[in-house]
């Protein structure tokens, strides 16, 4: 499943500062109920995102799945793990581990969002 030209905002999950703990008070990710007890290697393998895109599973069914997110303006790509849900109709990418990695020309920061393409991919866990 995939979608193009999807609005991607950013969120300050700060996973490294929160020890990659999905249930930390500063994080309180929706998927913590199911994924907070996963090993650190699993939780820290990919950057984090919230998902509410137009194509793909919702709620618990989306938790732990991976997306290949592409900034079509620059070609920059990254794999991100779904750890949360959102309500913006797209993605809410972690600032540190995902958004800044694909906002290679700084336009996303200037606009407050990126328009991205995403595709569900195998996390290879």
From Swiss-Prot:
Pyrrolidone carboxylic acid, modified sites: 1
Q: Which domain of life is it from?
A: Eukaryota
Biological process terms from the Gene Ontology for this record are:
defense response to bacterium; defense response to fungus
Q: One GO molecular function term?
A: RNA nuclease activity
Q: Does the entry annotate any disulfide bonds, and if so which pairs?
A: 31-63, 52-86, 66-123
- Which keywords are on file for this protein? Disulfide bond, Lectin, Plant defense, Pyrrolidone carboxylic acid
Q: Which InterPro entries match?
A: Barwin_CS, Barwin_dom, PR4, RlpA-like_sf
> In UniProt terms, what function does this protein have?
May be involved in a defense mechanism. Probable plant lectin. Binds weakly a chitin analog.
Q: What is this protein called?
A: Barwin
Annotated source species: Hordeum vulgare
